[in-house]
Amino acid sequence: MSNSNQPLLSKPKSLKHKNLCLVLSFVAILGSVAFFTAQLISVNTNNNDDSLLTTSQICHGAHDQDSCQALLSEFTTLSLSKLNRLDLLHVFLKNSVWRLESTMTMVSEARIRSNGVRDKAGFADCEEMMDVSKDRMMSSMEELRGGNYNLESYSNVHTWLSSVLTNYMTCLESISDVSVNSKQIVKPQLEDLVSRARVALAIFVSVLPARDDLKMIISNRFPSWLTALDRKLLESSPKTLKVTANVVVAKDGTGKFKTVNEAVAAAPENSNTRYVIYVKKGVYKETIDIGKKKKNLMLVGDGKDATIITGSLNVIDGSTTFRSATVAANGDGFMAQDIWFQNTAGPAKHQAVALRVSADQTVINRCRIDAYQDTLYTHTLRQFYRDSYITGTVDFIFGNSAVVFQNCDIVARNPGAGQKNMLTAQGREDQNQNTAISIQKCKITASSDLAPVKGSVKTFLGRPWKLYSRTVIMQSFIDNHIDPAGWFPWDGEFALSTLYYGEYANTGPGADTSKRVNWKGFKVIKDSKEAEQFTVAKLIQGGLWLKPTGVTFQEWL
């Protein structure tokens, strides 16, 4: 760690450089406001669409209505009382991209000039988060271009804009422990980006057609966004899948590569077709970061107890939570089957992630994911887990994706001294995000080391990591290691009235809801239509992308 009194720019000319940056930024902001206001005037004078709302109407559902209206006022003039919402969103996103690029430069300079491993790691996280956020905003503008919108388009944009806000918040979390001088230069710009991401979501939600806000389409066994080929792959016999793999990884030299990292590096970038890496039985001590350009990559092993990818990065030893993952997937369309993802850092090392997924339309099938605190980081976007075995202690399924778990074993372990087990810590930051954790037809049990001492160790279904945390447990078996209260607060009254925690049609000795918490945000779901909002079909639009993968899934209840 660098000294907290160490200035970011240590040379005498640094103050001039800093002041010059601030002046240039101010001038550029003024210029951008004028430019984008002019663009908006042009758009509105040529468009008499009936999708017009005042700024107060657009901001009605915003996290902070005053902030929303203040930011939108940059794009209005006294002669304009109404705005075309889609045009406004497009212009607003263009402006946000410009501001993001400016902030990226500042963050990059802060990383270069910072001292200490933790500082550099935090800023590196931010650079990555802003880079992918730019991509998501550009994709959103392209998706809505031309006026040919459908439910898939709306679902895509809602998911992508939700991820942008989460990325910015992840960035702020990663730099929370960096030196004060380094942080104070970039934090105001990052907080401005957060505000703009919230406004973009508010504008978009005001555009949404009348429909369920968690519209998802999944049928049969997998989400519908899986292609026919992907579905065939997941339904293929292990032998067939291994024979047809593009490359083989084997520690004994019988494959093309000896490490998974080598195989990932050799995989094509931005591939439109599935690229399969077969990883033979063995223990692979590697930290693997699958970049955003490694799209449609699939890792296949010899079984969730045979092919093991293991690491031990953790927060106590200097990593950020984001960077501690043994395997991190950032390329859209990521799939994994018959693999064991492991982080062996142990409970004393605090946050230590086994698998982090920041990739859209991800499928994890028949895998094992083992660690203690923060085992599985379902960071952003749409994810589906089937027939997998997940273990941990504190907040061991966490993040802010739209994620469904089906037919999984969710197993609490014996934690460190004085710790309580929390199965989930969902991180929804804004009421307009379409994110949630849905656990359907799973088994929630205690591990062999926890079962004998479960009377002395408190285990809960989850706690609210963020203000609008949203988690549903439905049609699952809940064993008696779960505390009768069911859920646990994060910090006092925080989020207890704004969260959404639901339980529906569960079984087992721990499923009794008579002694559950009486928070405003908790409810025992009685109506199947309400529960359906958290199915594969509605939460992750599974019907659009899971079918082609071949993975088994249940579309509805």
UniProtKB/Swiss-Prot annotation:
Residues 246-543 are annotated as: Pectinesterase 18. SUPFAM superfamilies: Pectin lyase-like, Plant invertase/pectin methylesterase inhibitor. Keywords: Antimicrobial, Aspartyl esterase, Cell wall, Cell wall biogenesis/degradation, Fungicide, Hydrolase, Plant defense, Protein synthesis inhibitor, Secreted, Signal, Toxin. Residues 1-34 form the signal peptide. Pfam families: Pectinesterase (PF01095), PMEI (PF04043). GO terms for molecular function: enzyme inhibitor activity; pectinesterase activity; rRNA N-glycosylase activity; toxin activity. It is found in: Secreted, Cell wall. Its EC number is 3.1.1.11, 3.2.2.22. Substrate binds at T321, Q351, R463, W465. The record marks Q373 as: Transition state stabilizer. One of its GO terms (cellular component) is membrane. The active site is at D374 (proton donor), D395 (nucleophile). InterPro entries: Invertase/methylesterase_inhib, Pectin_lyas_fold, Pectin_lyase_fold/virulence, Pectinesterase_Asp_AS, Pectinesterase_cat, Pectinesterase_inhib_dom, Pectinesterase_Tyr_AS. GO terms for biological process: cell wall modification; defense response to fungus; killing of cells of another organism; negative regulation of translation; pectin catabolic process; response to bacterium. Pathway: Glycan metabolism; pectin degradation; 2-dehydro-3-deoxy-D-gluconate from pectin: step 1/5. Residues 47-203 are annotated as: Pectinesterase inhibitor 18. Its main location: secreted. It catalyses: [(1->4)-alpha-D-galacturonosyl methyl ester](n) + n H2O = [(1->4)-alpha-D-galacturonosyl](n) + n methanol + n H(+); Endohydrolysis of the N-glycosidic bond at one specific adenosine on the 28S rRNA. Expressed in siliques, flowers, floral stems, rosette leaves and roots. The PMEI region may act as an autoinhibitory domain and prevent untimely PME activity during transport. In the N-terminal section; belongs to the PMEI family. Acts in the modification of cell walls via demethylesterification of cell wall pectin. Inhibits the elongation phase of protein synthesis. This is Pectinesterase/pectinesterase inhibitor 18. It comes from Arabidopsis thaliana (Mouse-ear cress). The gene is PME18.
